[in-house]
Structure formats: structure tokens, C-alpha cells
Amino acid sequence: MPGLLGKKIGMTSVFSAEGKNLPCTVIEVGPCVVTQIKTLEKDGYEAVQLGFQEKKEKHTTQPEMGHFKKAGVAPQRHLAEFKNFETEYKLGDVITVDFLEDAGFVDVVGTSKGKGFQGVVKRHGFGGVGQTTHGQHNRARKPGSIGACSYPAKVFKGMRMGGQMGNERVTVQNLQVIKVMPEHNLLLVKGSVPGAKGSILLIEK
């Protein structure tokens, strides 16, 4: 899907035309620069690689520097590929938030907040084990049994247990576009998006 890179600024709320108070997320979108154009003949598929947020040359590796010099653009901090652009772009072209002006709804891809190692109650919504009386004292938030007896004599794959929670790629689909502010490179979408303030997002049309 065609889209742009952006940065999560934070959340606020706005009033709709009907007077409803809508929670929304403010995203800084672009400007993104075209750093590579992939073609069917050369790469086996068609896509446009976009860069977001310039960085200094001293923070750029030599292979990266060669890539950016070939495109004739300044070093970019974040890169991402998008497919199915209707417009043909050239290396060095700049795409701004105006690109999303006619999009009524967008999909947002980000990395969720990391929660560290969490138990089954927080991670999977378990209710805990039975009563907390009659001598029970240390199993209120335990997972309980994880398998059968001598048969099948193993724990099945996918058994829900405690473990690392969050810090994974999450896609939220069909978020309504509340407002596009080209003068500030800002996009307001209804609801929340994954990640902490300042995290990088992919906004897909």
C-alpha cells in the first residue's frame, strides 16, 4: 500500500461538527524523500523507498552514504518501502502530508510499548486460580496446569504463558482522518496508535 513515514507526537481531543469530543492522535508525517525506486526488471517487484528525518554524515555508515549519494539526497535516519503508488516518482522527490489529503481512513503501523516480562494475568487476561481462601496463599495469579499426564507427555506449542510483552510490530486499521495540517506537517487521526511518543510510524493509505 502507498504511504508515508511519520512520528507520533502525542494525543489530544477535538470536537466534531456534531459537538462530540473525539480522542485523536497527532502524527508528524513527512516530508519524505524518495531514496530508491525498485522495478520489476531489476528487483523482481515494484516499490518506492522513502527516507524520513535527515541525519549527519558522521552518523552514517559508508555503505549507507553510497546509497544516499546515488539517490542525490541527504542521509536519512529512517527508511521504508511502499508499493502501489499511482504517481510515478523520481529519485530525490519530496512527498509531504498533502499526499493523505483525500484519504478518509488510514492504516498505521508501529512498535508497541515494551512491558518487559509479564505474567499470564496481565499478558493474556487470565483470571487467576480459584479461591484465595481455604489454605491457598501463593497462586492467585498463577497460570495453573499447562498440560496433561503421561500422555501426550509434552506441552503443546502456543501454550499461553508468562513472557516478554509488547515491543512488537502492531497494525491498526481504518483510523479515521480527522484533519490534515500541511503547514505543520501534521495529521490527526481518530483514536490511538501503537508506540510511545516520538516513535516512528508507517501511515498507509
From Swiss-Prot:
GO terms for molecular function: rRNA binding; structural constituent of ribosome. InterPro entries: Ribosomal_uL3, Ribosomal_uL3_bac/org-type, Ribosomal_uL3_CS, Transl_B-barrel_sf. The keyword Iron-sulfur does not apply. One of its GO terms (biological process) is translation. GO terms for cellular component: cytosolic large ribosomal subunit. Keywords: Ribonucleoprotein, Ribosomal protein, RNA-binding, rRNA-binding. Pfam families: Ribosomal_L3. Gene3D superfamilies: 3.30.160.810, Translation factors (2.40.30.10). Belongs to the universal ribosomal protein uL3 family. One of the primary rRNA binding proteins, it binds directly near the 3'-end of the 23S rRNA, where it nucleates assembly of the 50S subunit. Part of the 50S ribosomal subunit. Forms a cluster with proteins L14 and L19. This is Large ribosomal subunit protein uL3. The gene is rplC.
